[in-house]
């Protein structure tokens, strides 16, 4: 089960926002609320967000304080949205000669978010998060 979400960095709050592909420009952050149950998670959104976020299409673990069981970053150029690629190998190919990172967290913190904050990543590039797990949809 996977939910396709768009990433957006909110530098004013220093959080990474995850929003549905066709949602409004705001959404739940990765740090998120510490909602433990699906019912309290759904109520964490304002009524304006509930119309935009298909809560029934997201896995139950998406709203847990630990986040989804599995996250995979993909990207697509806005000109060719139908052909998405895995972000990690794509970015690694662009950064040939870059020292290899052993830890995914360090890679995201040191490479992706730094480049994003500095505006180096091409604005035509859209990043998506695929959260997949064995949990049931809410």
From Swiss-Prot:
Keyword presence, Transcription: yes
Keyword terms, alphabetized: Activation of host NF-kappa-B by virus, Activator, Apoptosis, Host cytoplasm, Host G2/M cell cycle arrest by virus, Host mitochondrion, Host nucleus, Host-virus interaction, Modulation of host cell cycle by virus, Transcription, Transcription regulation
Region (Mitochondrial targeting sequence): 68-113
Subcellular location: Host cytoplasm; Host nucleus; Host mitochondrion
UniProt-annotated stretches for the region Disordered: 20-43
UniProt PTM: A fraction may be phosphorylated in insect cells and HepG2 cells, a human hepatoblastoma cell line. Phosphorylated in vitro by host protein kinase C or mitogen-activated protein kinase. N-acetylated in insect cells.
Described function: Multifunctional protein that plays a role in silencing host antiviral defenses and promoting viral transcription. Does not seem to be essential for HBV infection. May be directly involved in development of cirrhosis and liver cancer (hepatocellular carcinoma). Most of cytosolic activities involve modulation of cytosolic calcium. The effect on apoptosis is controversial depending on the cell types in which the studies have been conducted. May induce apoptosis by localizing in mitochondria and causing loss of mitochondrial membrane potential.
Family label: Belongs to the orthohepadnavirus protein X family.
Subunit field text: May form homodimer. May interact with host CEBPA, CFLAR, CREB1, DDB1, E4F1, HBXIP, HSPD1/HSP60, NFKBIA, POLR2E and SMAD4. Interacts with host SMC5-SMC6 complex and induces its degradation. Interacts with host TRPC4AP; leading to prevent ubiquitination of TRPC4AP. Interacts with host PLSCR1; this interaction promotes ubiquitination and degradation of HBx and impairs HBx-mediated cell proliferation.
Name of the protein in question: Protein X
């Amino acid at each position: 089960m996977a939910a396709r979400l768009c990433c957006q960095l909110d530098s004013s709050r220093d959080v990474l926002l995850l929003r549905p592909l066709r949602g409004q420009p705001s959404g739940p952050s990765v740090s998120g609320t510490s909602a433990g149950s699906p019912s309290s998670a759904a109520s964490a959104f304002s009524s304006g967000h509930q119309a935009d976020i298909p809560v029934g299409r997201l896995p139950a673990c998406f709203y847990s304080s630990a986040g989804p069981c599995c996250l995979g970053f993909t990207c697509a150029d806005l000109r060719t949205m139908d052909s998405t690629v895995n972000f990690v190998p794509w970015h690694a190919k662009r950064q040939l000669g870059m020292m290899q990172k052993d830890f995914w967290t360090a890679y995201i913190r040191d490479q992706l978010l730094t480049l994003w904050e500095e505006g180096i990543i091409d604005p035509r590039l859209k990043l998506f998060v695929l959260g997949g797990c064995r949990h049931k949809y809410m």
